[in-house]
Amino acid sequence: MGSSRGESFGNFVDRIPMKMQPPGAQAETRVSSLLQRQGWQLLDRNWSCRWGELDLVLHKNEQLLVVEVKKRRSLAWGPWSVDPTKRRRLGRAISCWRAEHPIQTDWLLQVAVAVVPLPPSQGAPRWCRLDRLC
């Protein structure tokens, strides 16, 4: 069962000035802001269930995008941090989220990892799609 903690926590964090947010929240805010400028709408942030947490859940044109955000001190590539165990947890959490939001079950699902360098002067986020996740 999911929690509403994610939605209210995400809204709360978005109101905190970026420099006062913890590093992980800063990275999520950067990715969320970037995607929202591209027309994606944020549905949930830090949504959790017994299987795990979804950092960002967004939608645009009947597409659902789930983003796992990884902060890094540099742009050293980090999608390998999403190992097979983490992928299984992520897939189960996505299934739980979709079960709680049945109106979106027929939307095209995309899952991505965003590697975000902190501080922002280190560059823009890098993206990697995760295929065959769920």
From Swiss-Prot:
Gene3D superfamilies: 3.40.1350.10. Pfam families: UPF0102. One of its GO terms (molecular function) is nucleic acid binding. Transmembrane segments: none annotated. It comes from the Bacteria. InterPro entries: Restrct_endonuc-II-like, tRNA_endonuc-like_dom_sf, UPF0102_YraN-like. Belongs to the UPF0102 family. This is UPF0102 protein SYNW1051. It comes from Parasynechococcus marenigrum (strain WH8102). The lineage of its organism: Bacteria, Bacillati, Cyanobacteriota, Cyanophyceae, Synechococcales.
